[in-house]
Amino acid sequence: MSHHASGPNFGFPHGDARLDMTDLYAFTKPGDSAMSIIALNVHPSFRLDSSEPTTKEPFAPGALYEFKIDTDGDAVADLSYSVQFAWWGDGKQTATVRRIQGETAAGVGEAGEVIVEEAPVSFGREALVTKVGDFGFFFGWRSDPFFFDVNGNFNHMQFTGDDFFKDKNICSIVIELPNSELAANSLGIWCRVLVKDRERWIQVERGGRDRKSTRLNSSH
């Protein structure tokens, strides 16, 4: 699922790049068919409307990043993983992940079972992976795997073959989990980002399907 440049005028939710979703991935772990990987990419390192880079801080500590998983085909979440970040000494960040199952998975909040806390966030090339039981976690900067000829698209589909994203970065939230967590037949996955407003969580970003309208709709 690609969700780049989804805000008004190709901007970011609340003007904060750390809240901006770029891609959602879900796939079987290579070499281990009993495990799956879900990944949410946020915080592009670039702006489409400016040559200025975005902030070096990977994630917004005041935000809630959620994976919603529907396991019975009714488009309502039956399982949720919520991720929050906090500052830790020396300018570092850590992550806490909560697992929520059942009726409350469709809601919003900071409830649920904590399955990992104070997991390190990668600021550089080194991939800091945290393992807890059957779960694996990664949080931090990576090269943006998406590819697209942005300049060709904006030039009336006169494509150049150049990948605009080849030197761009994003911040990844990656969870490796056993297939027993997921449905055997019907499975739906989407993500969203929320921030607090007067003690209430407010959704500022959501995605689960490719965002094709900005590429194919001539009115954009």
Indicate residue ranges for each PLM-predicted region.
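Positively charged, low-complexity/disordered segments
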Residues: L216-H220
